[in-house]
Curated annotation (Swiss-Prot):
This is Heat shock transcription factor, X-linked member 3. The keyword Transcription regulation applies. Pfam families: HSF_DNA-bind. GO terms for cellular component: chromatin; nucleus. Residues 79-182 bind DNA. It comes from Homo sapiens.
């Protein structure tokens, strides 16, 4: 019975009160609480916990958010860089544990599995490289001139990769400008081989200049022929003149002198090549009739030559006036 009474009294103490007064179970003053401070201490701890939780939630997120914003901006700027500069930046930073420099600082050591999880599997704004495959990443290393090496003093570890490049060194970012993709070098080489196009233009211009040179040379040859025609005709005319003079001398010795007037030829003989012979023959006949030829031949042969020269040059002057395409009298007949 005593135990039942004590249990009822304990339940009455734990029951909630309405309006600040306890429910059934006896007056409050009849059964005092043996531990009056225990409930208050518990309530205070709960209140402190509730007061600390909102404060901690309000104070911690701004720092985390700012740090995340900074990381997102850094990753975004890092994504815009070239492949060698991206790799050099993450190797220089201590936050990435999957990549590091060797002791000499001229090669990069990559942990395959950790690098796959830490770097290549980044998504969204935190992404660094365009590819998420380790095979594609290794292909990029080869395209930019990185060579795979193995340390001689340690056994081969399949999880570790070591790549080196003469322009990829620790604390030397300026050397990164010398690293170029092999495709770009190939394109520049192809452009260098395509340079001979201007030579074709030069060849075309040379052919044209040769053709112009031949045309000009032909014109100059024609001019020289035209200028040299009188000199060529001169000796021939002189020869014909000499022949005609000799013939006239022979005719003067053969035929006696007469006093008849000079006779005109049957047809016009002042044009063409036949004019020389006709003119000389008529002049000879006229001089034979007047008796001038005999005196000239026997007295002074030089005066006869001068007379024939005058007649010859007069004939050449008259013939030069004619056009070369004008037909002669013989052709018309």
């Amino acid at each position: 019975m005593a135990s039942q009474n004590t249990e009822q009294e304990y339940e009455a103490k734990l029951a909630p009160s309405v309006g600040g007064e306890p429910t059934s179970g006896g007056p409050s003053g009849s059964s005092p609480d043996p531990n009056p401070d225990s409930s208050e201490v518990l309530d205070r701890h709960e209140d402190q916990a509730m007061s600390q939780d909102p404060g901690s939630q309000d104070n911690s997120p701004p720092e985390d958010r700012n740090q995340r914003v900074v990381n997102v901006e850094d990753n975004h700027n890092l994504f815009r860089l070239s492949f060698p500069r991206k790799l050099w930046t993450i190797v220089e930073e201590d936050t990435f544990k999957s990549v590091s420099w060797n002791d000499d600082g001229d090669a990069v050591i990559i942990d395959k599995d950790l690098f796959q999880r830490e770097v290549l599997q980044r998504k969204g704004a935190e992404r660094i490289f365009k590819t998420d495959s380790l095979t594609s990443f290794i292909r990029q290393l080869n395209l930019y001139g990185f060579c795979k090496t193995r340390p001689s003093n340690s056994p081969g570890n399949k999880k570790m990769m070591i790549y080196c490049n003469s322009n990829f060194q620790r604390d030397k970012p300026r050397l990164l400008e010398n690293i170029q993709r092999k495709d770009a070098l190939r394109n520049t080489a192809q452009q260098a081989t395509r340079v001979p196009t201007p030579k074709r233009k030069n060849l075309v211009a040379t052919r044209r200049s040769l053709r112009i040179y031949h045309i000009n040379a032909r014109k100059e040859a024609i001019k020289m022929c035209q200028q040299g025609a009188p000199s060529v005709q001169g000796p021939s005319g002189t020869q014909s003149f000499r022949r005609s003079g000799m013939w006239s001398k022979k005719s003067a010795t053969r035929h006696p002198l007469g006093n008849g007037p000079p006779q005109e030829p049957n047809g016009p003989s002042w044009e063409g090549t036949s004019g020389n012979v006709t003119f000389t023959s008529s002049a000879t006949t006229w001089m034979e009739g007047t008796g001038i030829l005999s005196s000239l031949v026997y007295s002074d042969n030089g005066s006869v030559m001068s007379l024939y020269n005058i007649c010859y040059y007069a004939l050449l002057a008259s013939l030069s006036v004619m056009s070369p395409n004008e037909p002669s009298d013989d052709e018309e007949e």
